[in-house]
């Protein structure tokens, strides 16, 4: 025991000392970088010191024992015999450690290595010697060795962060963040989603998203890591091996479930009029029985069918159809009818006198003969087609049998030819011809003009020789089957499989299994015979009877479920015929040994082009009937309906004393109900009811002795319920009372239905459809829709609040009312008729305004006059050998310029300028009007276009017209005529000429802008794309205006237009008084008074002082102005160019979608959101955009104000004015463009109002055009201010947040949206070209995709250096015309409309190819910039 304990102690101490003491000593020696000789010296020194200690201690204690001397001598001899051990550092240290391993105290504080090999040999001398040596050596260790050699020091500690850094240097931990597709795919390759292209992709295993991301990051660290990714950018993986199973999973939990917690499922049952027969029948018969006879199964297709049996099954089906048609014998019946009509016509023609009645009969006969002949031909054609199909199928079967060398089916087809009696046929035809001749002779004798009748007779009685079908197929099962030994190996295996298959059927009654058939084998003709009768005794009402067909081979599987109908009460045992119910199974069975399988496509050998995919199908033959007892009585339960029970219950109840039962209150209703139900009068259950019905019939029209209110209800109704339901005004009143109608909040309800347009109800229905949540669209599109719906709801609630406190004046109701304030105004009105007329100085008269009630469809037209254009780009081609190389035009609107590239091309090659043939198209409401084609870069048309206009709902009131959201497009095109010579045509032949139009630019303005103003007139800058392939600027330049010489406008196109509505429509502005709110403060009241005074001075100028927020609270407009931070992403793009940063911020604001036009912009209420809500919802009106842009400019310390005015092309607008060092700049938030104050082409027409965070200023200058306005609002003679100067210093608390928090746009959703837009545009282009094929040039599309990202910020060259050579290669073979268009993302439909307006799809030149690329640049908060590059390519001839 002591020896074993000692060995255990040595092992523990050695393990502990090995980890601490040895490591410390080794680390010290390693740090001093001692070589092997120094280590040996240290070992010798230590060993000598130990020996000296031993000698001294032994001298003091006395002489050693013989045992100790033996041990020392043994140790000394072994040390001499092994000099290599002394040289080793580890062995010298272990020698020292071995001399102190037996101390008990050392095991508590140190860890040692195992004992030396020589030490155990000392223990073999005896147990007694060991015990003596133990105590002495332990004391020696404590006193001498431990105190001199071991040193006590603090433990070394290493920081956790340093350990982590060391681990990171050796261990790679992949990130769980998602990886973009560009890193996983080859360069310039877009992900390809096969599912979106219509391919079937099997379901892949579900993997945790973070795990998948880690795996992708780990693979990308490898050199060949991209080979692990597929075309879609996902890791390639096999489909999931887990298949969904319908097997029930047992509860395998060990602990038993509390029985009180178990759910007991019970089937819902009807009210107990006796679900059980036993409880209901009392003493009557209680046993009812159904007899189910299951005959067998017949498979119309089986997975063990070979191709011959597939054809035989088809032949059987065709033969059954042929037999059915032969039984119907429709063709023969029509032939006999035709013969009878011919005989009747013959008899009528033989009559000597033809009266009016006879002529009508003859005409009717002729029509019937014609129709009957057509029907006969149709039915005869069906019979012939069916016969041909039978013969063709039989021919395939014979060919297949001959090819495979054996016969698998006993089917045999024989065709018999039936001889017809030709005499009867010739006789019938001769009779028809004689009838026709006699009819014509009589008409000539009578001399009557029966041209129409003779025409019909001659046309319809011309009956050709009828050739009846003389072939009759007969199908038999007499063909001899090939013996098994003579068949192929595959056929032998297939027949062996047939013998192994067995089937059985389970019978379920009311979802409970009641019986099961015996297992029957499958025969070679694929029939399974059961022939078993099952007697089902009923205790509950029969609800459903289900038969489950099972297939049994190596395993049992469910093949199909069959639900058979319950028999009626006349179907008794022995009197029912067999019935058939079809079944099918979608079970997938792969073919193996010559069979075709099931649910697997295959090709017929007889017809290699016919591909079939058949499912396992067949039919079950059975009969279900009610059984008979010993006496021959049917065992059928008598049904008892709910109404009969109520009648029996209320048999003796007085009708007048029970007012709660409606059918007993009104005898007439009870009488009508009894007639509709058709109650059996012989049923004793209804005896009392039939007595009442008989009594009512005999009573007739006797007046009852009691009063019935329902009988007099019609007299109380002033109009019928049908007319009330059709009344439009009544429907509107109901909707307004329910608070669901917003259109008539600020106007009275029309009195007559004719004044109410149907558009009101259409808008209400469409509004309800839009409010339904959208689930099948992109999340960004869904955000746009939800934001618009949210703003509509907010506006609706605030409008209801305004209506409650608004009051209308007389002028708001009476349109013709004109208030005369004083007598002087009356005198002026009279003097107008007396003052002289000066012909040389005519006075301008205002156009007469027409009221909406006097306008009908066709009275209103939009007049658009196209005067002339300036600086239209011209076509430019370069001559390089025999090839024409097109160049491209760069617009000055975009920052993308390539003048150096163009100059280099021009210097190297010879250039010549082609002429341009421009024309203008005006488009409104999908109707296009075109001007004549002019010539040159500065054409003059001077043409007036009258655009037809029809208001939706035929309502021409201003409120209805203001709902029209359509735009008026004025597009400039270049007409090109191209001739194409066909290859097969001679040189002298003239080629085909094709006209194509190339889009050059457009001017767009909404219809609402034209409605608000009397006219739109002037010279406007045309919006042209940044790049126009194939075009360049003209060398000649004409200044559009005299005051535009100083500006550099050589790279701009201008168009002079005039547009108006004829006649002008009058409208009434509704300005509700908003000063009746209970929570009005002194400042808000002052603002309302200030607004009234300003409107009195200049009624046509805009002034806004107070608005409502999205919570319906009224605020001063100055509280919306506050410096707010723009997105940091925009600030990091142009770090050293502040002007470019301001332009980018203005562009960012213009990309936020605008709120659709309000139902009536003259409702006098303004609802503005804060800038934070405008950014978060990604939608806003014009004023909210201007406020947001102003707040961004204030963030940079610029002096900015919001300007309210009127634009020529946009109507009411809101601009931002910034004061620079020497000038004022006008920023348009809707387009992001900046204009100088004295820019003649600035679309701003009037400056009406300014406001910032301190005050509101109203423009009281007589001329309010931007070029004439003096913007120093400190001058009170020019600007009228709302707040006095003593109040301006104290800033009012803003309702804007301290800062706006932005979030990044999901790039995966942006990519998904880009793919959707690109697919939709391609399908639309093909849809717009129904008569021409549409070919897409992939190489050009690839190049355009590389160009688009560089156009967003206008950086880089037109084509990249990598794609330059590829683009030049395309230009060598194609004439390329195209352009990019840019727009903010609102919805997909707006992008489709913009592409359609360019007309690039209208190219009719054959073999025209197209290229289309879409790029979406994401900004924060789902604000997107959409670029669409369109190009058409025509191959050089």
From Swiss-Prot:
Coiled-coil residue windows: none
Cellular component GO terms, alphabetical: ciliary transition zone
Record's protein name: Protein CC2D2B
InterPro entries from the UniProt entry: C2_dom, C2_domain_sf, CC2D2AN-C2, CEP76_C, CEPT76/DRC7_peptidase-like_dom, DUF5523, Tectonic-like_complex_comp
Source domain of life: Eukaryota
GO BP of this protein: non-motile cilium assembly; protein localization to ciliary transition zone
SUPFAM superfamilies named in the record: C2 domain (Calcium/lipid-binding domain, CaLB)
